[in-house]
Amino acid sequence: ILTELEKYFTVNFIDYKDIDKLSPDDFSIIFIATGGVERLVIQHFESLPRPAILLADGMQNSLAAALEISSWLRGRGMKSEILHGELPETIKRIFVLHSNFVAQRSLFGMRIGVMGTPSSWLVASNVDYLLAKRRWGIEYTDVSLDRIYEYYGQITDDEVGEALSLIHI
């Protein structure tokens, strides 16, 4: 499976002892080559990439090990996904996961202005600012509608036109 993946991706093997050398900007997949590695993965839980993407080729009991590891990780609130099955589907899924990873990393350090608050009957529409910062590195800032109206009243049509000319869609 790894030989086939190298036709589509740059594959760098990192020994589990060097997992702490990976940066948050490195897209990482954990290759479960054999059964019996469950304890090893659990021992390095804090260093694992999040979410944990587990690749199993079905050889040497690797799928059973990946299932066991995934179940253990999910039991501790960590998202995980197992890549296993037909190679073309696995390759497509890796492309999607990588694209999602790049998009998420591009949000890191961004600030998002929040205008207004959800209506009281919307019980699941509140944003957990602290969780968003921890998970994605995004900072939410409350912006009062009075401040928006103030800026709206000060802006000229020429300034709007100039700002719109800078937007490339």
Regions found by a protein language model. Name each.
Residues 14-108, 118-128:
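Cofactor- and metal-binding active-site motifs of prokaryotic enzymes
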Residues 1-11, 67:
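Short, charged N-terminal beta->alpha structural module
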